[in-house]
Every structure is written in structure tokens, then in C-alpha cells.
């Protein structure tokens, strides 16, 4: 094992233990670092700021988005900061490299009508359809992340109180309320889930809340496909995914007057600044309503 491989492995283990990041995030870190060192052609101890700047410039010339380039630079900063704090290197070369300035895009979200159509789309009494309905209702009702939904266990659900216990980023737990429609969908799903277990004599792991036909915990990819499938079914042309439903949940709450700090808690954001992006969405919505409704906003006829 080379020094580079040794350092990358140690860094990834450190991230996993300290932050509890998902396997998807860890793979992204690994890919970013391997790509950088393939470019740098030197061991971590010999990396200088000019090498990092050269890598960033190459990424931009390749046509990578500013968001992607900023993420790669963030990975390098975290990596070299770790090596410096552990005494593996004497100077942190990433510390003096300027950030990539990116314009923060407003999150996409569904209209109220489309959100209602989406959660009503699954209507058959089949296991997969009732499961899909419960998933869509829960997304719109709670705003949880796809990784949080896939990680839910039966014991995390309290239908009597209308609450779920969610494990978010860094394995931080929070309690999130569940709406009446989502509760009803979950009850139907749990009943048909039990029938499936008996009917197919599946050797189910009793823990996962959402499972596939084989009784295994549902994956992120499967959930993304479910959301995309029903979005197409109701005629939404833009590509949407689970995160769109998270944005929809937050945006609709704000439009109805919910306090920003309450939304922050529900979403599991560590910082209020992350949640504040939705105030821009709400402002855009208010301007659109004004333009359509206020007499003085209309051109002379």
C-alpha cells in the first residue's frame, strides 16, 4: 500500500467514525481523492497549493459544474486538514486555495396541486403500490431525506402519536411529526406487508420499515425510481426525485406561514443559513402571486 492509499483509507475511516456519513458520500470522497492524486502524480506530503489550483483549473476546463468543482475542493480541504491535524504533513496546502464561487440555485419544488396528485397516484391494493403510496405520503408529510427514509425501522414509527424517529446526517436523531394522510397510508402498507410475509413465507428481517418484494430493506435507488415513476405518471415533465419532495415540504410550510426555525428542526439542518434558501423561494412565489393578482402590476390594456 502506498502512502497515498494509506492516508486515503485512514481519512475515510475517520470520516465514517466521526460523522457517520453514508457509503454514497464516502465513495464520493474516495473518487475525488483518487482523481486528484492521478492528476497530481505526487504523494500527499509533496502536494503544494499550485498543484491543487491546477487540478481545480483542469476541472473547470473539462466543463465540470461549479458545484462539482466546489465539492472536490471541499474534499481536498477536509483531507489535508485531517492529515495536518494528525501530524502526517507539516503544512496544509489546501488552506490557502481560494473557494470556488457558486451561485446558489433555488430549490425546485412541486405546486400544491402536483404534490396532491403525486401522493394520490398509487391507487391499487397491491403490496408495491401501497408501499409506494406510503413512501410518497411520508416524504411530503415529513420532508425527510431519502437515506433517512430507507434507514427507518419499524420501531422508529409511532402511529398512535403520529411521530417518527429519524437518524440524519452524522447519525443525529430527531423526532418528526407525521400527517394524518401519511398515517393512514402507513397503516394500510403495514397491514399488507404482514400479509406478504405470511403469504410468501418470507424470512423477513423484521427491522426495516420499507422493504422490497424479497423482504429486503429498500434501497435509495429503488426509492428514486418510485418517485420518478409516479412523477411521469401524473405528467410532471421535469426530472424530480426524493429531494424535490423535501424541498416541496419545506416550501409549502413556509408559504403557509410556518416559522423558519421550526422548518430547520423538521429538516434536520444544523444551520439556519441552510434553511434560509426557502425564504427566497417564498419571495419568488409572493412576487408571482402579486403579478397575477394586483391591479397595479398589470400593464394597461
From Swiss-Prot:
Protein name, entry field: Tyrosine recombinase XerC
InterPro entries: CB, DNA_brk_join_enz, Integrase-like_cat_sf, Integrase_catalytic, Integrase_recombinase_N, Integrase_SAM-like_N, Recomb_XerC, Tyrosine_recombinase_XerC/XerD
HAMAP family registered for this protein in UniProt: Recomb_XerC_XerD
A Pfam family this chain is assigned to: Phage_int_SAM_1
Core-binding (CB) domain ranges (all copies): 2-84
Keyword annotations from UniProtKB, A to Z: Cell cycle, Cell division, Chromosome partition, Cytoplasm, DNA integration, DNA recombination, DNA-binding
Sample GO molecular function, one term: DNA binding
Record-annotated Tyr recombinase domain positions: 105-291
Gene Ontology cellular component list: cytoplasm
Function: Site-specific tyrosine recombinase, which acts by catalyzing the cutting and rejoining of the recombining DNA molecules. The XerC-XerD complex is essential to convert dimers of the bacterial chromosome into monomers to permit their segregation at cell division. It also contributes to the segregational stability of plasmids.
Lineage: Bacteria, Pseudomonadati, Nitrospirota, Thermodesulfovibrionia, Thermodesulfovibrionales
GO biological process: cell division; chromosome segregation; DNA recombination; DNA transposition
Native organism: Thermodesulfovibrio yellowstonii (strain ATCC 51303 / DSM 11347 / YP87)
Disulfide feature: none
Gene for this chain: xerC
Compartment(s) where it occurs, according to its Swiss-Prot or TrEMBL record: Cytoplasm
Active-site residues, Swiss-Prot/TrEMBL: 145, 169, 243, 246, 269, 278
Subunit-structure text: Forms a cyclic heterotetrameric complex composed of two molecules of XerC and two molecules of XerD.
Gene3D superfamilies: 1.10.150.130, Intergrase catalytic core
Family assignment from sequence similarity: Belongs to the 'phage' integrase family. XerC subfamily.
Amino acid at each position: 500500500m502506498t502512502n497515498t492509499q494509506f492516508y486515503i483509507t485512514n481519512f475515510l475511516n475517520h470520516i465514517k467514525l466521526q460523522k457517520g456519513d453514508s457509503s454514497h458520500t464516502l465513495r464520493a470522497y474516495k473518487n475525488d481523492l483518487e482523481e486528484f492524486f492521478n492528476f497530481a502524480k505526487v504523494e500527499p506530503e509533496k502536494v503544494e497549493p499550485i498543484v491543487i489550483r491546477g487540478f481545480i483549473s483542469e476541472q473547470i476546463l473539462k466543463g465540470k459544474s461549479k458545484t462539482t468543482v466546489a465539492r472536490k475542493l471541499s474534499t481536498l480541504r477536509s483531507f489535508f486538514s485531517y492529515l495536518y491535524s494528525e501530524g502526517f504533513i507539516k503544512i496544509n496546502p489546501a488552506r490557502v486555495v481560494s473557494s470556488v464561487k457558486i451561485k446558489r440555485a433555488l430549490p425546485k419544488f412541486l405546486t400544491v396541486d402536483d404534490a396532491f396528485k403525486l401522493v394520490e397516484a398509487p391507487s391499487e391494493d397491491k403490496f408495491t403500490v401501497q408501499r409506494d403510496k406510503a413512501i410518497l405520503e411520508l416524504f411530503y408529510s415529513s420532508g425527510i431525506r431519502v437515506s433517512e427514509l430507507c434507514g427507518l425501522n419499524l420501531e422508529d414509527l409511532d402511529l398512535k402519536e403520529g411521530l417518527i424517529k429519524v437518524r440524519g446526517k452524522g447519525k443525529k436523531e430527531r423526532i418528526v411529526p407525521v400527517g394524518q394522510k401519511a398515517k393512514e397510508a402507513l397503516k394500510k402498507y403495514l397491514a399488507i406487508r404482514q400479509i406478504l410475509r405470511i403469504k410468501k413465507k418470507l424470512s423477513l428481517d423484521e427491522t426495516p420499515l420499507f422493504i422490497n418484494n424479497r423482504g429486503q430493506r429498500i434501497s435509495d435507488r429503488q426509492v428514486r425510481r418510485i418517485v420518478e415513476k409516479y412523477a411521469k405518471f401524473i405528467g410532471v415533465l421535469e426530472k424530480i426525485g426524493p429531494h424535490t419532495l423535501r424541498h416541496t415540504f419545506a416550501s409549502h410550510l413556509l408559504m403557509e406561514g410556518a416559522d423558519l426555525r421550526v422548518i430547520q428542526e423538521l429538516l434536520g439542518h444544523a444551520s439556519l443559513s441552510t434553511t434560509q434558501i426557502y425564504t427566497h423561494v417564498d419571495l419568488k412565489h409572493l412576487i408571482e402571486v402579486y403579478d397575477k393578482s394586483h391591479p397595479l402590476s398589470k400593464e394597461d390594456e
